[in-house]
C-alpha cells in the first residue's frame, strides 16, 4: 500500500500545492502499475493471473485517484468558505 507520509507525520499541510505534491507519488506509482500490467498482458492476453493483476492495479489506481479528487475538492470548498466570510 502506498505511504501517504505527509499526512501521518503530524505535519500541517496548509495549501493545495502541498496536498497535490503529497498525493503525486502514490498516483504516479499506481499509474505505472497499471501500465506495467497492460504491458505484461501483451505477451499472454489470456493469462488469468495477469488479468487479475491488471484488475487489482486498476482498482488501486481508482481508489488513489478518488482519494486525490476528494481531498482536492474538500480543500477547495474549505478555502472557498473562508474567502466568502471576508467582507
From Swiss-Prot:
UniProt-reported outcome of changing residue 16 to A: Shows drastically reduced NF-kappa-B/AP-1 activation
Cellular localisation: Secreted; Cell surface
Segment forming the signal sequence: none
Impact when changing residue 82 to A/C: Shows no Yop secretion in the presence or absence of calcium
SUPFAM superfamilies membership: MxiH-like
Any one biological process term the GO annotation gives: protein secretion by the type III secretion system
Keywords, comma-separated and alphabetical: Plasmid, Protein transport, Secreted, Transport, Virulence
Effect of residue 13 to A: Requires increased levels of calcium to block Yop secretion. Can assemble needle polymers on its surface
Anything else known: The YscF/SctF protein can provide a protective immune response against lethal plague challenge during subcutaneous plague infection.
Record-stated family: Belongs to the SctF family.
This protein's name: Type 3 secretion system needle filament protein
Species per Swiss-Prot/TrEMBL record: Yersinia pestis
Organismal lineage: Bacteria, Pseudomonadati, Pseudomonadota, Gammaproteobacteria, Enterobacterales
Amino acid at each position: 500500500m502506498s505511504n501517504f507520509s505527509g499526512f501521518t507525520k503530524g505535519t500541517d499541510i496548509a495549501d493545495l500545492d502541498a496536498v497535490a505534491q503529497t498525493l503525486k507519488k502514490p498516483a504516479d506509482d499506481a499509474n505505472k502499475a497499471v501500465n506495467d500490467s497492460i504491458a505484461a498482458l501483451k505477451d499472454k492476453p489470456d493469462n488469468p493471473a495477469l488479468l487479475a493483476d491488471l484488475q487489482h492495479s486498476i482498482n488501486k489506481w481508482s481508489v488513489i485517484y478518488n482519494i486525490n479528487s476528494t481531498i482536492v475538492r474538500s480543500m477547495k470548498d474549505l478555502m472557498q468558505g473562508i474567502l466568502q466570510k471576508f467582507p
